[in-house]
Curated annotation (Swiss-Prot):
Gene3D superfamilies: Kelch-type beta propeller. Transmembrane segments: none annotated. It comes from Escherichia coli O1:K1 / APEC. The lineage of its organism: Bacteria, Pseudomonadati, Pseudomonadota, Gammaproteobacteria, Enterobacterales. It is found in: Periplasm. This is N-acetylneuraminate epimerase. Homodimer. SUPFAM superfamilies: Kelch motif (SSF117281). It is an enzyme of class 5 (isomerase). It comes from the Bacteria. Keywords: Carbohydrate metabolism, Isomerase, Kelch repeat, Periplasm, Repeat, Signal.
């Protein structure tokens, strides 16, 4: 027993303001996206609107620098990845030319050398919002996310309802009162080759698609952790994609953040330890759903997790805590640790700080 406790010792490192992980973001930052290349961090979109910023983490005087604005308009839930020195941004949720909220399936490329954006003549075969993106062998892979037709239809209906609260209530009840499988979340794995700008089918989950999962990859393995199984209902599932050999294998690991799960959590690696932290969800929604209530989160308050879990010996252990619950920020690998930038806390408040989670000998260190 003592040995177990020792292995899960929580070390909460307290630092003065001038020793914070990174300078505060230029604006409170949530629901955006980010990537890192050659120790330079890039973040943008979400609550930052069309703005993008970069920060050289190795600079003596660390500061955020504004970049050229994103040409595709403000967006939430876009994803991004660096491939061969260029930053690619995939999809997201925003307004179309008619002012309607919609899911996009487009791709934009940013060239750091010229500080310029270009919209590629390439469209994914389905919408990309709530999806995850990771890079393997020079290609970007996308999976998960909401169904574009169902999501866009919901917002078209809300737009037509205007300010009629009775009609809006009916639309919401109709939208949320369905089983998880009736939302057709994306369970396909798509690959994007930047050299050809072509999308290809790369496989599909033998289980179900999720939205708002956390993703982390190392070598030939990628993990998808939690996320929504349907609007308002999270899952505690953890999926592993194994690219070892010629055939992609899908595995299901032990669950985490049970029983309700979270969405918008943070995932990363530190000294070969798989980390999962934070996220938001509705406590009691899973029980409601299992009892036949499809509108499972109706009347429930969104809660924000501060838990830090480590994957150890085939199971998840709660191994530490964030200073407060947080979700919907950016997870990046940095200094052999998990770097969290921004996010939102209770009440949906966007934040400007960063957190660094490190693991050594199964001991968690949290630097704020």
């Amino acid at each position: 027993m003592n040995k177990t406790i020792t292995a899960l010792t929580i070390i909460m490192a307290s630092f003065a303001t001038n020793a914070s992980v990174l300078p505060e973001t230029p604006v409170p930052f949530k629901s955006g996206t980010g990537a890192i290349d050659n120790d330079t961090v890039y973040i943008g979109l979400g609550s930052a609107g069309t703005a993008w910023y970069k920060l050289d983490t190795q600079a003596k005087d660390k500061k955020w620098t504004a970049l050229a604005a994103f040409p595709g308009g403000p967006r939430d839930q876009a994803t991004s990845a660096f491939i061969d020195g260029n930053l690619y941004v995939f999809g997201g949720i925003g307004k179309n030319s008619e002012g309607l909220t919609q899911v996009f399936n487009d791709v934009h490329k940013y060239n750091p050398k010229t500080n310029s954006w270009v919209k590629l003549m390439s469209h994914a075969p389905m919408g990309m919002a709530g999806h995850v993106t990771f890079v393997h062998n020079g290609k970007a892979y996308v999976t998960g996310g909401v169904n574009q037709n169902i999501f866009n239809g919901y917002f078209e209906d809300l737009n037509e309802a205007g300010k009629d609260s009775t009609t809006i209530d009916k639309i919401n009840a109709h939208y949320f009162d369905k089983k998880a499988e009736d939302y057709f979340f994306n369970k396909f794995l798509l690959s994007f080759d930047p050299s050809t700008q072509q999308w290809s089918y790369a496989g599909e989950s033998p289980w179900y698609g999720t939205a708002g999962a956390a993703v982390v990859n190392k070598g030939d393995k990628t993990w998808l952790i939690n996320g929504e199984a349907k609007p308002g209902l999270r899952t505690d599932a953890v999926f592993e994609l194994d690219f070892t050999g010629n055939n992609l294998k899908w595995n299901k690991l032990a669950p985490v953040a049970s029983p309700d799960g979270v969405a918008g959590g943070f995932a990363g690696m530190s000294n070969d330890s798989l980390i999962f932290a934070g996220g938001a969800g509705f406590k009691g929604s899973r029980e409601n759903y299992q009892n036949g209530k499809n509108y499972a989160h109706e009347g429930l308050k969104k809660s924000y997790s501060a838990d830090i879990h480590l994957w150890h010996n085939g199971k998840w252990d709660k191994s530490g805590e964030l200073s407060q619950g947080r979700a919907y920020g950016v997870s990046l690998p940095w200094n052999n640790s998990l770097l969290i930038i921004g996010g939102e806390t209770a009440g949906g408040k966007a934040v400007t700080d960063s957190v660094l989670i490190s693991v050594k000998d199964n001991k968690v260190t949290v630097q704020n």
